[in-house]
Curated annotation (Swiss-Prot):
One of its GO terms (molecular function) is mannosyltransferase activity. Catalyzes the transfer of the L-Ara4N moiety of the glycolipid undecaprenyl phosphate-alpha-L-Ara4N to lipid A. The modified arabinose is attached to lipid A and is required for resistance to polymyxin and cationic antimicrobial peptides. The lineage of its organism: Bacteria, Pseudomonadati, Pseudomonadota, Gammaproteobacteria, Aeromonadales. The chain crosses the membrane at residues 83-103, 111-131, 174-194, 205-225, 253-273, 286-306, 311-331, 346-366, 378-398, 408-428. This is Undecaprenyl phosphate-alpha-4-amino-4-deoxy-L-arabinose arabinosyl transferase. It comes from the Bacteria. GO terms for cellular component: plasma membrane. It catalyses: 4-amino-4-deoxy-alpha-L-arabinopyranosyl di-trans,octa-cis-undecaprenyl phosphate + lipid IVA = lipid IIA + di-trans,octa-cis-undecaprenyl phosphate. Its EC number is 2.4.2.43. The gene is arnT. InterPro entries: ArnT_tfrase (IPR022839), Glyco_trans_39/83 (IPR003342), LipidA_mod_glycosyltrf_83 (IPR050297). It is a multi-pass membrane protein. Pathway: Lipopolysaccharide metabolism; 4-amino-4-deoxy-beta-L-arabinose-lipid A biosynthesis. It is found in: Cell inner membrane.
């Protein structure tokens, strides 16, 4: 791979931006964020987040702002929904390039750090997926980079400006995802400055960072409090304390959860990981920058491992410094003529592709584990081509590995290009209901009232029909809080109340109920519909209006 100034921009263009519009939105996350921002644009309310027309206090506002601006620029498209995440990832890669250049004065290390970062499986997956983690990671990366730069000796004015900038980055992180965005800088920087015996400097200048962060966040924080006095109570206690520390925390997982998931996320560069960490540990006492990067990787990982609530996206901030450590070690190994790590990495990619091919074969031909049905033969073929390509890209490096090792960056890109055409219909109906909704758009648009028995389905309906008032049937899900307000009365229909409610609703026109059923297609007890449309686990019940 030739090192040119166009390589990274072209890589980002072809493998990040161009595929964004090729696959439907995944439920529930992408539909949720798409719909929240669509409602923000349509209502003009840029202060209080709403979802399905209901108050939704799960996150602060900045991520929704960026998504809404994207929709204003690019329309109600899947590209627009994902653009903010992709753009944030690209800016993180640019920041990594600049920071690596400052640390090592080596363009090759800077280039490889950015390339490795962009092609990490976890970074690519989250960076082309509409969630807030790529955006908050950008602000955390900016905060961590700015702090390391200002820790160097400089004039009083430059230090003051640097700490103010550090605070602004932390403030944007807070406005994007809340208090948890402040945890990463704290758990890394405080131990680091104590180890470096520079705690007094942090005590002297740290309040400036706090001041700039508070001044940045205060206008919206005050505005949302004046509009919705319960916002901060719910956001702090439910979305932070209960999610991360309480016994009933969301997404509970064992302490070691991030170890296997993190290793998988480092593909296609897993073979470079042990050497990078080992060298970082060996150089921690003689290289301040290496110690800083190592702390940036390990301490947030430990923090999120201790928390009871865990999601893979939480550890995304650990991968910018990890990419830099791997790139620096790779360049040093090449200078020393050592190829073992690159050969191991090539073998790992080759074997990973082969293992995935075997798993696909089992899923395709085992009656008890079948995922691909008779109608999915084309999708199965594409999936096999994807992992055969991944394997081939690994094995062809073994000849002249010192020249070809960067081909590993293309492994996830084969997956990125082929994925939209490799999904079985059962998965599409379960996780990508957009296609089913598009196929039944006419009958849905004729319906005066729309219901769904799942919040993810409701958000898909809202996005697909451009209607926010989708009623919830039999399950309140993540909007239970918003449904508790008096002005949301009537937005939820219990199963026991459905027959009587339906009789009244049909007087105002056609009613459509979209349901996600169990694997046997059971809808449970509901009145017999005038029309029934079924596709795998999706069932659409149409009740004509009363004559």
């Amino acid at each position: 791979m030739t090192l040119t100034k166009w390589a990274l921009p072209l890589f980002f263009l072809f493998f990040y931006l161009l595929p964004l519009d090729q696959r439907p939105l995944w439920s529930p996350d992408e539909n949720r964020y798409a719909e929240i921002s669509r409602e923000m644009v349509s209502t003009g309310d840029w202060v209080v987040p709403h979802f399905l027309g209901l108050r939704y206090f799960e996150k602060p506002i900045a991520g929704y702002w960026f998504n809404s601006i994207s929709q204003q620029l690019f329309g109600d498209t899947n590209f627009a929904v994902r653009f903010a995440s992709a753009a944030a990832t690209g800016l993180s890669a640019l920041l990594i390039f600049w920071f690596a250049l400052q640390l090592w004065q080596c363009r090759r290390k800077a280039f490889l750090a950015s390339l490795i970062y962009l092609s990490l499986l976890i970074v690519y997956g989250i960076g082309t997926y509409s969630v807030l983690d790529a955006m908050v990671t950008l602000w955390l990366n900016a905060a961590m980079v700015s702090f390391y730069i200002i820790r160097k000796e400089g004039s009083l004015g430059s230090r003051i400006g640097g700490y103010l900038l550090f605070g602004l980055a932390c403030g944007m992180g807070f406005l994007t995802k809340g208090f948890i965005a402040l945890a990463v800088p704290v758990v890394v920087i405080v131990p680091y400055v104590i180890y470096q015996r520079r705690l007094l400097e942090l005590v002297r200048f740290g309040p400036l960072a706090i001041l700039s962060a508070v001044l940045l966040a205060a206008p919206w924080a005050i505005a949302v409090h004046l509009r919705e006095p319960d916002y901060w109570h719910y956001f702090f206690w439910v979305e932070h304390i209960q999610r991360f520390a309480a016994d009933n925390a969301q997404h509970k997982a064992p302490f070691w959860y991030y170890l296997p998931m993190g290793l998988l996320g480092t593909l296609p560069w897993l073979g470079l990981l042990p050497g990078a960490l080992r060298k970082g540990w060996q150089e921690r006492k003689i290289s301040p920058e290496t110690l800083y990067l190592l702390a940036w990787v390990i301490l947030p990982l430990l923090f999120f491992s201790i928390a009871k609530g865990k999601l893979l996206t939480y550890i995304l901030p650990c991968f910018a410094p990890l990419a830099m450590l791997m790139a620096a070690n790779a360049v040093d190994l090449l200078k020393e003529g050592k190829e073992r790590a690159f050969k191991v990495n090539a073998w790992l990619n080759g074997l990973f592709g082969l293992i995935c091919l075997v798993v696909l074969a089992v899923l395709a031909f085992s009656p008890s584990h079948a995922v691909y049905g008779e109608e999915d033969q084309g999708a199965l073929a594409v999936a096999m081509v994807i992992f055969a390509g991944w394997s081939l890209l690994g094995f062809i490096q073994l000849k002249e590995v010192s020249r070809r090792w960067t081909l590993s960056a293309l492994c996830p890109m084969v997956l990125a290009i082929g994925l939209p055409w490799a999904l079985p219909q059962s998965l599409i109906d379960s996780k990508l209901p957009e296609r089913f909704i598009e196929a039944n758009q006419a009958v849905l648009m004729k319906s005066g009232t729309l219901l769904a028995n799942d919040v993810g389905l409701a958000s898909s309906l809202a996005w697909g029909t451009q209607r926010s008032e989708i009623n919830l049937f039999d399950s309140k899900g993540e909007v239970h809080y918003g449904l508790g307000y008096p002005d949301a009365a009537g937005r939820y229909v219990a199963r026991a109340d459905f027959p009587a409610w339906l009789e009244q609703a049909r007087k105002n026109g056609q009613v459509a109920l979209l349901m996600k059923t169990d694997r046997d297609g059971n809808t449970g007890p509901v009145p017999t519909a005038d029309e029934t449309i079924v596709s795998h686990r999706l069932t659409l019940l149409i009740y004509h209006g009363a004559q």
